[in-house]
């Protein structure tokens, strides 16, 4: 994630009441100070927070949530210091979503971000709370995120960057660079295909040249039958299959039925594809073999080298 993330859709509403109930059994301090609680109750709450965060972040390998939960009380010095550790993140959850209490974060000395929503931010940032008057109004806990390896990040639009990964986890589109072993029936050398989690394929590049016909095929075998052979009426001569029952992009346990295929339409989306295409040209040393067999006598074998780039795209 970036250094700051604001949760403004009530993501933590399900545990807000649990935190309020936990506060009722906390021994109240008579001085203006914070109270840190660690118990079996906070472990359960931490587990709930972890599950919520897993739904919010993509390409995360592991999320650790501290079972130490700090209830923040009014401090007359208006300054909060919980730890000297500046690695990881703080998560702030408001006990009551009143707009009067605010978190102020300072990315730079000249910049302030103010929020009255639940918020998560890097421990390296300076911060303070405003209008925390009388009683406990919010809780804080420490969060650690470990990300899956990312090949690179590519700008998708003016405000968003996407991680390009070699991992299937938490992704829903695979950009496949497919190089074909020489064969007298094949007219192409390299094609690039988008494969969604239902296995449907969209041809987007030939010889690294953008292809805009937007024809969606139910499988890679169907795409090959329609597009890569020199012979006319190939469908009347043979059909293709993968004897291992594999999909070209996804493990079988990752396949999902009913997915809509992402089709690039806007200039920004085609610019994104062009950037991905350029990266693929110079980062294709890792590949898998994929084999299709034609039911001729004797059988005809077509071998492909496939380099895979996984992306998570929000689309309908």
Swiss-Prot record:
Swiss-Prot/TrEMBL keywords: Early protein, Host cytoplasm, Host nucleus
Compartments it resides in: Host cytoplasm; Host nucleus
Record carries keyword Cell inner membrane: no
InterPro entries per record: Poxvirus_C4/C10 (IPR005004)
Family membership noted in the UniProt record: Belongs to the poxviridae OPG031 protein family.
Free-text function comment from the UniProt entry: Plays a role in the inhibition of host NF-kappa-B activation. Mechanistically, blocks the subunit p65/RELA translocation into the host nucleus.
Protein name per the record: Protein C4
């Amino acid at each position: 994630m970036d250094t700051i993330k604001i949760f403004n859709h009530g993501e933590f509403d399900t545990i807000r009441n649990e935190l309020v109930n936990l506060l009722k059994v906390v021994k109240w301090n008579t001085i203006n100070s914070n109270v840190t609680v660690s118990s079996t109750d906070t472990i359960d709450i931490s587990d709930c927070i972890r599950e919520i965060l897993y739904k919010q972040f993509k390409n995360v390998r592991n999320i650790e949530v501290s079972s130490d939960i700090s209830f923040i009380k009014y401090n007359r010095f208006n300054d909060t210091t919980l730890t000297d550790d500046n690695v990881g993140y703080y998560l702030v959850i408001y006990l009551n979503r009143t707009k009067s209490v605010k978190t102020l974060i300072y990315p730079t000395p000249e910049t302030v971000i103010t929020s009255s929503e639940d918020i998560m931010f890097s421990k390296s940032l300076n911060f303070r709370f405003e209008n925390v008057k009388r009683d406990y109004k919010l809780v804080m806990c420490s969060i650690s995120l470990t990300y899956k390896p990312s090949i690179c990040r590519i700008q998708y639009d003016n405000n968003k960057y996407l991680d390009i990964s070699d991992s299937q986890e938490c992704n829903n589109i695979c950009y496949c660079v497919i190089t074909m072993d020489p064969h007298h029936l094949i007219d192409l050398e390299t094609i690039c295909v988008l494969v969604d989690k239902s296995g449907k394929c969209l041809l987007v590049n030939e010889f690294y040249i953008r292809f805009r016909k937007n024809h969606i095929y139910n499988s890679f075998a169907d795409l090959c039958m329609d597009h890569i052979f020199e012979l006319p009426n190939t469908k009347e001569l043979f059909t293709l299959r993968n004897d291992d029952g594999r999909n070209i992009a996804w493990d079988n346990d990752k396949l999902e039925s009913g997915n809509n295929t992402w089709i690039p339409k806007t200039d920004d989306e085609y610019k994104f594809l062009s950037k991905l295409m350029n990266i693929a040209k110079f980062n294709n040393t890792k590949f898998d073999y994929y084999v299709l067999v034609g039911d001729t006598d004797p059988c005809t074998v077509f071998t492909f080298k496939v380099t895979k780039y996984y992306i998570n795209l929000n689309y309908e």
